[in-house]
Amino acid sequence: MAQFYSPNRRVTTRKAIPAKNLTVTVTSLDPFGQGVARHEGKTVFVTGVLPGEQAEVQLTEDKRQFSHAKLKRLLTHSPQRVEPQCPHFTRCGGCQQQHADITLQQSSKTAALMRLMTRETGAELPDASLIAGTPYAYRRRARLALYFQAKEQRLLMGYRQSNSHDLVDIKACPVLRPELEALLQPLRDCLSRLKAVKRLGHVELVQAENGPLLVLRHLDPLHPADEQALRDFAEQQGVSVYLAPDADSLTCLHGDEPVYLVAGLTLAFSPRDFIQVNDAVNQQMVAQALAWLDVQPQDRILDLFCGMGNFTLPLAQRAASVVGVEGVTALVEKGRENARRNALSNVTFFHQNLEDDVTQQPWVAQGFDKILLDPARAGAAGVMEQITRLAPKRVVYVSCNATTLARDSKVLLAAGFTLVNVAMLDMFPHTGHLESMALFLHDTGTRKA
């Protein structure tokens, strides 16, 4: 569902507490980049302070077991503190960790992942590996909110402030791919001249393999002069332009269907389809999944929550046959289209609610040697028991939520699988987002019927 900026939107605020200053020493970072300290036996989370740094902080929230505080003054500085590259850092809510060296960010996220997996599964785990790309200029997709400021008679374009619905009017965004960052000022200029400038919702920027594109969400039908202005902008900047008058409609005003590359394959996608934000990490993630599954020419493989085929089609290049299962009809159709585009005839896509029992489906009858799943944040609770009944030799679980990965892992471990590899995917450097993948092996001698 589309979301729009509203200056009158109610913001929930924490109950004010009496101002209280503390001096604390941070010992670690949590997965979200907050410094973790102890004071009088209680954990204190404080933004902007790194491990080893001592700081004067002010409490903003005081609970029975923990407190939150804001930084007042740094008393010592860590050698792992670096200068943020973004001029909007600390105000913009997009990034939280640009002040921390990238190796510190990655080690903190990896440690948090392993603590969670160990605590929840009770298993003896191998050291986690790291999959990462460049810390800047990585983001190939972004949504910028738009709001016309009547008092100043100017268009604001940017991201939300931290813990606020207010907009930060950005002039630069160094985590964006350079092709997208270069569009910020000319795009702002173009949109500011539209007759519909007061009735714009947001703009999405996407860097496809065949060039950048934008999706403009507008609240009223556009005047022909506005459409022509956008066509002129598209031609001048080499950009494809799509118009979105509502949450469901999409019209190409100028340009070609976007594509991206993965494992040497070309995949077409709709501008609103999900694709991984970080291309470099996606390439490595797919390669790691293929290696962990140890795909053989005789293998029959199942890909659950397959989307448009990001893993499915590279698997089909190597296996005897692959079945992709997805709950979104449009993505199933796009997966089939991409299979035809890449001349892959050994892959079949099915639309299926993965909360249902898929073990009775005809395409399950032959069984599967290996399974890959890449669910959304809610995880795959509804399908884990079905995976154990299929008893594949290998399972690769790709996760955007370590909590649900840990929960679902327990089902596999209880069924006789062994967790042999874990990787932390730094898909979103400088943010608190943590993604991961895990490999489970099953003793074929104990496979269930």
UniProtKB/Swiss-Prot annotation:
[4Fe-4S] cluster binds at C86, C92, C95, C173. Its EC number is 2.1.1.190. S-adenosyl-L-methionine binds at Q276, F305, N310, E326, N353, D374. The keyword ATP-binding does not apply. Residues 15-73 form the TRAM domain. It catalyses: uridine(1939) in 23S rRNA + S-adenosyl-L-methionine = 5-methyluridine(1939) in 23S rRNA + S-adenosyl-L-homocysteine + H(+). It is an enzyme of class 2 (transferase). GO terms for biological process: rRNA base methylation. The active site is at C400 (nucleophile). Keywords: 4Fe-4S, Iron, Iron-sulfur, Metal-binding, Methyltransferase, rRNA processing, S-adenosyl-L-methionine, Transferase. One of its GO terms (molecular function) is 4 iron, 4 sulfur cluster binding. The keyword Amino-acid biosynthesis does not apply. NCBIfam families: PRK13168.1, rumA. Belongs to the class I-like SAM-binding methyltransferase superfamily. RNA M5U methyltransferase family. RlmD subfamily. HAMAP family: 23SrRNA_methyltr_RlmD. Catalyzes the formation of 5-methyl-uridine at position 1939 (m5U1939) in 23S rRNA. This is 23S rRNA (uracil(1939)-C(5))-methyltransferase RlmD. It comes from Pectobacterium carotovorum subsp. carotovorum (strain PC1). The gene is rlmD.
